[in-house]
Structures are given as C-alpha cells and as structure tokens.
A protein has these predicted regions:
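Conserved catalytic core of sirtuin-type NAD+-dependent deacylases
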Residues: 1-185
Length: 185
C-alpha cells in the first residue's frame, strides 16, 4: 500500500517513529487503553495518520485481484487495514489487523462504514470522534494494541498459507507477531 501513498509503520520515517503531540508514542496512542481513556485524542491521531480516503489501489493490488479471478490465488492474508485489496477487486481477503472501512457503536453495536465515520456531521462537537445515532462512541474495526486478533481469521489465514503451493510475501518486514509466524506454521 505504500505505493498507493499509505505510509508504512516501521521504517526510519514510518508512523511508529514519528513524534506526536500527545506525550506518548504512536503505538501507545493506538492501544485499547488509550482509546478508552483518551478517545478524542485517539481519534485526532487516527483520522490524521491512519485514514487515507483518497488513496487508490496500485498495480500490485490489481495484479493480485486478477490472479484471484483466474483461480491462481486462493486468498490474501494482510496486516494492512486500508481496504485497498477489496477496492482492487479481491474477494477472499483476511485482514488480520482489521479494517478502517468499518466501525461499530460501543453502546448498541450498530455497524457503520467509513463514509459515515468521516462525515463531520456525525463527530462529537469540537473533536474528531464519530458518534452513533444513539449517541455512543464508534470504535473502528481495527485491532488495537492490547486487543486479541480474531481467532477465526487466524485459523483461515494459517489454513490458506499451509495449503498454498506457492506463497507470495510482500510489503512486510515480517517482524509483527503472530502474523510473522504464519509462514512457519
């Protein structure tokens, strides 16, 4: 996704090495406890650094979608949260770190799409925090630090990898666990 204009996380100039105005690291900001305790600050960072509504899939996204259409690719296992694989036409995508494309109300559970989340008329007054029609805070469907990965997605991912004749690994440093261990499973 970096070729599409989405910044990476772990390089020298990546998001995790950037300074923030919140007196803590970016990794602390995208933690469950920070979200729960400083929701408005979380959303300010999230909206400015993790949401890129204008990015488009690149040639690699389209090539992978084409391979899937041809029956040559069974699944995409990704740590990306940007939804670009689906935007390119891929159907069987396992987003193990979740997606920015959805959010759900922490009060009533209602689900919303990214367009709703980005619509400022739904934001808490004076903040970036999107609210449900019931007034509850929306939580993005991304896996924050201190949260568990979805067991069903992990099982599907490991199964797809273990059954693959050929494995294409791209755009990752393979240092984030447990995803990095999937290739050894």
């Amino acid at each position: 996704s970096t070729e599409s204009g989405v910044p990476d996380f772990r390089s020298e100039n990546g998001l995790w090495n950037a300074k923030t105005r919140f007196n803590c690291t970016p990794e602390e900001i995208v933690s469950h406890s920070f979200f729960m305790n400083r929701t408005d600050d979380f959303y300010e960072y999230y909206m400015q650094n993790l949401i890129f509504p204008d990015v488009k899939p690149n040639a690699t996204h389209y090539a992978l979608a084409k391979l899937e259409q041809m029956g040559k690719l069974k699944a995409i296992v990704t740590q990306n949260i940007d939804g670009l694989h689906q935007a390119a036409g891929s159907k069987e995508v396992y987003e193990i770190h979740g997606t920015i494309s959805r959010a759900h109300c922490m009060e009533c559970g209602k689900e919303y799409d990214l367009d709703y989340t980005l619509d400022k008329s739904h934001w808490k007054e004076g903040a970036y925090t999107p609210l449900c029609s019931c007034g509850g805070v929306l939580k993005p469907d991304v896996v924050l630090y201190e949260e568990a990965l979805n067991d069903e997605l992990i099982m599907k991912s490991v199964k797809a990898i273990s059954e693959a004749d050929t494995l294409i690994i791209g755009g990752t440093s393979l240092v984030v666990y447990p995803a990095a261990s999937f290739v050894n499973s």
